[in-house]
């Protein structure tokens, strides 16, 4: 596995541990359906939380959350729709971003709740 993939996986591990520590129940990690993918799907206070995880070694080229572009948001929304249909989930949905910055653990973690809303097409 490429070094950047290992680094990203380490960040996702830390993000999941952070969420569990905060009382979230992890439903799925790296959920795939065809080309659709969600980093973390969790439940918290009767909501389904879809979390996009971004890990960076530093912020020299911008903040990690800036990598969640409109195109990426559309993919996350489409993936969430597939997830809701597959598992017949009937909960309100919230979209969060967790950023992790640092060379290795402990990372600096930022949890951005309600980071974006589904666009109206």
Curated annotation (Swiss-Prot):
Q: Which Pfam families match?
A: UPF0102
By sequence similarity, the record places it as follows: Belongs to the UPF0102 family.
What protein does this entry describe?
UPF0102 protein BVU_1879
Highest taxon of the lineage: Bacteria
Care to name a GO molecular-function term for this sequence?
A: nucleic acid binding
């Amino acid at each position: 596995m490429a070094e950047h993939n290992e680094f990203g996986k380490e960040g996702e591990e830390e993000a999941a541990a952070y969420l569990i520590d905060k009382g979230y129940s992890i439903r799925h990690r790296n959920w795939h359906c065809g080309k659709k993918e969600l980093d973390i799907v969790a439940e918290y206070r009767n909501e389904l939380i879809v979390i996009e995880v971004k890990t960076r070694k530093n912020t020299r080229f911008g903040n990690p959350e800036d990598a969640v572009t409109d195109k990426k948001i559309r993919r996350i929304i489409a993936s969430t729709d597939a997830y809701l249909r597959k598992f017949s989930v009937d909960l309100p949905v919230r979209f969060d971003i967790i950023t992790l910055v640092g060379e290795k653990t402990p990372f600096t973690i930022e949890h951005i709740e309600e980071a974006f809303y589904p666009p109206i097409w």
